[in-house]
Every structure is written in structure tokens, then in C-alpha cells.
Regions:
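Charge-rich, low-complexity N-terminal segments
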Residues: 1-133
Length: 133
């Protein structure tokens, strides 16, 4: 089995509902995402996949869908205020935890036909969540 990893960085804000710690307040993170792609064999170029293809599609989607956006649970009471300020918001069915965001990125990569096997979502330099399909 061959495996390659593409690393992507972006910034986002969020807060967690029904949470007692500091993350119940609006705050931001500098995220790092590691996307593992695997194959039993290599293509005619000797690659699992071209890193540039992964960058164009996945970095492009992350830049447009998540980067410098406020990621919030769709029931968050702060949404109307942020909308009135024309802040960029992405609403999710669940709390925007590292676990949920890892799964979201995994699912998008899979939907684009990439042979993704694992996504690691680093919320801080010392804390990450992993989602495997």
C-alpha cells in the first residue's frame, strides 16, 4: 500500500454550544489539515496522485468554503448579529469541533474522487482530531 499526505493551512473562527470551557466563546484558530491518500498501486507516472491535483481541488475548496469564515452550529444565537454585520458564516448541523471538521473535509475529498483514507485536523499545534473512512 502506498500513501501520500497533503498538508493544507487555513484560518477560521468558531465557538461550541453546550460547552463549559473557553471554546464556548467566539475565537479563532490557525488550522492545519493533513489529508492521507492511498493506493495499492502507482499510476503510469509512478504516483498515488499528483499533489498539484489535490492542492487545486481541496485547497481551492477549503479557501472558498472555510478559510477566514466563522463556523457555527446552525442553532447558534449569534448568527443574526453576525449576519447583520455581513460577517462570513458557515453553519453546520453539529458543533464545529475538530472531529466534525475532519469528517467534513474527508467527505468532500471522497466526493471529488480522491482516494482519501484519513484526515487529521490540527486545531492547535498540539491538538488534532482524526477521521478515517
Amino acid at each position: 500500500m502506498f500513501r501520500v499526505t497533503k498538508e493544507i493551512h487555513f484560518c477560521y473562527g468558531h465557538r461550541l454550544l453546550n460547552y463549559e470551557g473557553k471554546c464556548r466563546f467566539l475565537h479563532g484558530h490557525n488550522a492545519k489539515v493533513e489529508i492521507d491518500l492511498s493506493s495499492e498501486s502507482l499510476d503510469h507516472r509512478g504516483m498515488v496522485i499528483d499533489f498539484n491535483d489535490v492542492k487545486q481541488v481541496l485547497q481551492g475548496w477549503i479557501d472558498s468554503a472555510l478559510d477566514h469564515k466563522m463556523l457555527l452550529n446552525k442553532t447558534d444565537s449569534v448568527i443574526p448579529q453576525l449576519n447583520s454585520l455581513k460577517e462570513p458564516i458557515v453553519t453546520l448541523e453539529r458543533n464545529p469541533t475538530a472531529e466534525v471538521l475532519a469528517q467534513m473535509i474527508f467527505d468532500y475529498a471522497k466526493s471529488q474522487g480522491f482516494p482519501v483514507t484519513e484526515v487529521r485536523f490540527w486545531e492547535t499545534p498540539t491538538s488534532f482530531a482524526t477521521y478515517r473512512g
